[in-house]
C-alpha cells in the first residue's frame, strides 16, 4: 500500500496537470473566441461562449464583457444596451468600473443618447487619480461636440492636436472631433479634411 508521501506526491502532480490544462484551455478558448468574432461567426461564437467549459474557465463578468463586445460588433443595439445595463448594475472593482463606464459613454455618445451620455459623463467627472481629469475633459469635449453639436472648442482641439505629437490613437480621436466641430459650423471642406486625416490614423492604428 502506498505511503502518505507517495500519495501526496501523486496529488501534487495531478493538481499541477489540472492547472496546466486549464491554463492552456483558457488561452486557446480566448483565442478561438477572438477568431470567431473577427470572422463574424456569431452562432459558433455564442455556442462556445455559453459552453460549460468556458463557464468554468472564465468568471461571469468576463464572459458577459465578451458578449457585449460581440453585440457591439454585430450592431445589435438593443442587446448591447441591455448588456450595458446589466454590467453597470454590478458592484465592480474600481478599474473594471472605470473601463466599463468609459466604454458605455463612448457607445451612448455615438448613439446620440443624450440622457445616458449625460449620466455617464457625471460619473466620469467623479473619477479620481491617474489621468482622471484629462479623461473627464476629453469626454466633455465629446459630449459637447456629438450631443450638444457645439463648435466653440475648435481652437482648443487644434492646440491639443499640435501638442499630441505622433501618437496615432490620440491624433485619430482629436481629428475626428475637429471634423465634427467643423461640420457643426457648416464648413464642409474642413470637415472632410479632418475626417480624412482621422481615417488615415485609424488605419495606421489597426494595421
Residue ranges and their predicted role:
Residues 1-30:
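N-terminal signal-anchor transmembrane alpha helix of single-pass membrane proteins
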Residues 21-31, 56-65, 93-102, 130-141, ...:
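Generic helix N-cap/helix-start motif at coil->alpha-helix transitions
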Residues 22-96, 111:
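N-terminal topogenic membrane-targeting module
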Residues 36, 71, 108, 144-148, ...:
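Residue at a conserved register position within TPR or TPR-like alpha-solenoid repeats
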Residues 44-52, 77-89, 113-128, 150-165, ...:
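Alpha-helical repeat scaffolds
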Residues 98-120:
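A membrane-cytosol interface segment of integral membrane proteins
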Residues 175-207:
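Alpha-helical oligomerization segments
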Amino acid at each position: 500500500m502506498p505511503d502518505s508521501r507517495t500519495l501526496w506526491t501523486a496529488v501534487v502532480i495531478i493538481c499541477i496537470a489540472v492547472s496546466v490544462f486549464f491554463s492552456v484551455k483558457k488561452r486557446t478558448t480566448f483565442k478561438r473566441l477572438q477568431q470567431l468574432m473577427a470572422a463574424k461567426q456569431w452562432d459558433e461564437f455564442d455556442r462556445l461562449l455559453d459552453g460549460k467549459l468556458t463557464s468554468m474557465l472564465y468568471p461571469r463578468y468576463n464572459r458577459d464583457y465578451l458578449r457585449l463586445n460581440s453585440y457591439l460588433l454585430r450592431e445589435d443595439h438593443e442587446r448591447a444596451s441591455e448588456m450595458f445595463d446589466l454590467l453597470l448594475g454590478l458592484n465592480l472593482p474600481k478599474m473594471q468600473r472605470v473601463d466599463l463606464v468609459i466604454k458605455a459613454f463612448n457607445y451612448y455618445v455615438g448613439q446620440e443618447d443624450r440622457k445616458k451620455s449625460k449620466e455617464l459623463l457625471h460619473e466620469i467627472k467623479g473619477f479620481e487619480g491617474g489621468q482622471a481629469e484629462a479623461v473627464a475633459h476629453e469626454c466633455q469635449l465629446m459630449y459637447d461636440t456629438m450631443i450638444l453639436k457645439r463648435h466653440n472648442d475648435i481652437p482648443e482641439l487644434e492646440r491639443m492636436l499640435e501638442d499630441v505629437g505622433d501618437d496615432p490613437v490620440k491624433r485619430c480621436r482629436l481629428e475626428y472631433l475637429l471634423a465634427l466641430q467643423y461640420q457643426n459650423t457648416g464648413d464642409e471642406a474642413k470637415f472632410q479634411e479632418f475626417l480624412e486625416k482621422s481615417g488615415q490614423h485609424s488605419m495606421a492604428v489597426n494595421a
